[in-house]
Amino acid sequence: ADVHYCAAHYYDPARALYPDFNPFWEFVAGPLNAGSFGPNTLDNTFGPQVVFQKAPQAPNTSPLAGLQFFGEMRVDPRSRDLTVAFVDINGATVFERTLDAQGR
């Protein structure tokens, strides 16, 4: 996705217009060095829930405003759990979520 903010979305079949799927997560982050702007309205087909979002109040916000993000993912070698984190331009973690490994 071409995004200029960061967000964690959970897609839930119980809330979806089209419910024939397993629930899933979407993590988006950006940009690395460009103007920032917020999200568009989410399509309700897959029942999205915005669990976390950090975006500027105005479009085309300068990178100097500090709203630049990237994501990090770590897999625990023992449990195989996946941890996803959003990090800002200053190196601060602004969001973190651990997902349990499936099928173990």
Regions found by a protein language model. Give the residues of each.
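Long, structured stretches of catalytic cores involved in phosphate-ester chemistry, encompassing
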Residues: A1-R104
